[in-house]
Amino acid sequence: MLGGCVVANVNLNKVFNFYEEVPLSGTLRSFISPNENVCFVVKTVRDMAVFTDKRILVADKQGSTGKKVEYYTIPFKNIITYAVETAGTFDLDPEIKLILSGGVTIELKFVKSKNMDQLLLKVYNLINNFMIG
C-alpha cells in the first residue's frame, strides 16, 4: 500500500514473437471495433496480433493448454517513441521496440523466416504512417 492506495505488481514490459502473416480468425474478429479497419494479422505458434489502422491487438495465450488468453490493446496514439532493430550476426531476430505513455515497453520480435524483413517493414510502416502521417 502506498499513500492509501493499493499498488499492483504488474509487469509492464512485454515481448511478443511473430513469424508469419495469417488471415483474421473469428475469435479475434469479435474484438475489432466497427470503426477500425484490419490491416493484417501475424502469429507465432500460440499468439496472434491484429494490426488495425488504430491499434495493435495481441492475443497472448497463457498456460500449458493455451485455453486462457490475455488480450493486450496497444493504441497507436499511446506510442511515445519507437525503434527498429535489424538482425545481426548473433541476434538473428529483428524487432520493433515501442515505448508507450507511462513507461511501458513492448517488443515485437520477428522470428527468422523468409518473409521476416517484409513483415517487419509492414509493421513499421503502419506505425510510422499513423505517427507522422
Enumerate the language-model features and the residues they cover.
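Anionic N-terminal interaction surfaces
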Residues: 2-49, 113, 130-133
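A general marker of short, structured functional hotspots
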Residues: 12-15, 72, 78, 120
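Phosphoinositide-binding peripheral membrane targeting modules
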Residues: 32-48, 52-104
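Pleckstrin homology
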Residues: 115-133
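Canonical phosphoinositide-binding patch of PH/PH-like domains
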Residues: 100-119
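Intrinsically disordered, low-complexity segments enriched in small/polar residues
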Residues: 1-2, 64
